[in-house]
Amino acid sequence: MNIKYFLLIITILGFLARSRVLVIAGLLLLTIYEFEIDFVFEFLGNKGIEIGLIFLLMAILSSLVLSPVDGEVIKDNLLSWQGTVAIIAGVLATKFNGMGLDLLQESPQFILGIIMGSLVGIVFFGGIPVGPLMAAGIGAVLFKIIEIIKG
């Protein structure tokens, strides 16, 4: 399939799924492709995830800057059972994200399935498409489980 048509399909699916993020990403990539600014693709391939993660982390941490929390409240929260669960979830999420990044670097063709799964999740389950790395990480874990079961 021609990459231009693929990007157009992704953009249209993003529009149908009401995913502004997917529409903007698709349109930007389509524009970059049409204007033959190929070095942008190389840059995004090499640094895009890192830059995106920096902005994501800044967005999350900015809430602490806007409404500072007392140190005692932070300590009480971290030492509660909910805080412990949150810490474990953070550890698992970062591990899964790392596994997902490895999977996508080794087998980039899986991104198509992740995009399709994300679209199904958005359209039918009201999901939010913010975690392709997490989706790939869950896929990597499921692949390992299936490999173990199959022997």
Curated annotation (Swiss-Prot):
GO terms for cellular component: plasma membrane. Keywords: Cell membrane, Membrane, Transmembrane, Transmembrane helix. Pfam families: DUF441 (PF04284). Its main location: membrane. It is found in: Cell membrane. It is a multi-pass membrane protein. The lineage of its organism: Bacteria, Bacillati, Bacillota, Clostridia, Halanaerobiales. This is UPF0756 membrane protein Hore_21770. The keyword Transport does not apply. Belongs to the UPF0756 family. The chain crosses the membrane at residues 7-29, 49-69, 84-104, 110-130, 131-151. InterPro entries: UPF0756_TM.
